[in-house]
């Protein structure tokens, strides 16, 4: 989904997510990665507005909804929500 292409800063809004300081999502086409600083991160497939994580994180899915210039996300595991976050595009 081209509208998601780019580098996004991630901010925790609530739930069981840890503080997300330094966390970014890098998306290109139908693939992406959640990264913490320079460390390689968790890979995912983009399916519509869902980010479906690959092994070893199979079962984790981020569901995104547009909110102006940003996206609001629900972090889920096997269909159960455990956290909320926002994604804002970086200047990169």
Report each predicted region and the residues it spans.
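Tryptophan-anchored aromatic micro-motifs
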Residues: 1-37, 73-75
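Short, compact, well-ordered microdomains
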Residues: 54-92
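Contiguous, well-ordered beta-strand patches that form the walls/edges
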Residues: 16, 29-70
């Amino acid at each position: 989904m081209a509208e998601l292409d780019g580098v996004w800063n991630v901010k925790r809004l609530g739930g069981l997510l840890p503080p997300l300081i330094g966390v970014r999502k890098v998306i290109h086409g139908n693939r992406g990665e959640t990264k913490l600083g320079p460390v390689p991160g968790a890979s995912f497939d983009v399916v519509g507005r869902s980010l479906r994580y690959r092994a070893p994180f199979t079962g984790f899915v981020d569901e995104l909804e547009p909110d102006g210039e940003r996206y609001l996300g629900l972090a889920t595991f096997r269909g159960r929500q455990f956290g909320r976050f926002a994604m804002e595009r970086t200047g990169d």
